[in-house]
């Protein structure tokens, strides 16, 4: 029996992940989910759900360990980036009797920090957009000029932002009323971006990059014990807060090869997601890594590449091979939900 504890079971990826695991393991699989919420959308796919304390509270790991013992957990699969670090640090101590499905703590810390990630990839000779670290308003204005502003847009990124948090596309000449009415509050002028940061102390870790005008790609990748097992390239045609709302599986060997190079260089393990965007000359350049199961993993699974099931099989010591995806498979998201009985 494979018994898996899923932490942060209320994340965007949880339902698709549970569906993928159920499809890959018709028998011999027990899923236990935990979250700080009283209920989560993936509950119908779980054998048991438990509410746990906040991850930063002293009782969080105590409850995780108790549940592992109670349910005979063989594998712990953290679904949030923050909990990947926590579980990775505990894998040799309190979780020594289980397999943690995730990258090592040092790899997650690099992958989740865009400044450290870009510096590491630059040192490895991987193609990147031009970028500069900005540490105060003066360096923000200076970097913007160096990267071509106001003639070209530039992109301001929080080093530790996820889900498009801390992301600003800086363009010249945007009317103030247009920025006021913007739902996303993403496109701003340099003056507005600087004003939003005026007086902030301490200054957050920020970087400014060139704007990439090409197509955006999101690559689901699978590595196990340092070996590349395959990936699926998805073109992101529309997105909202970092989550693809219209995406298609495409045949782009060049993008897949770049994803392999980045994954191998950084050292992510199991299922991760690497995002690229095309430069003016069409080259796919790295945007970021999500060192966890992505929110749109269901598209790769629907296309025939069940990365989560293969990852779990490998973690359980079984032989498994990732099937190639069906090119052209597309997802168009709409709002739906899980109805729980009263």
Task: List PLM regions with ranges.
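Peripheral (often C-terminal) accessory segments that flank ATP-dependent C-N-forming ligase machineries
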Residues: 279, 309-342
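Conserved metal-phosphate-binding beta-hairpin within the catalytic cores
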Residues: 231-233, 264-299
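ATP-binding N-terminal substructure of ATP-dependent carboxylate-amine bond-forming enzymes
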Residues: 1-103, 138
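Phosphate-binding site of ATP-dependent enzymes
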Residues: 180-260, 278-285
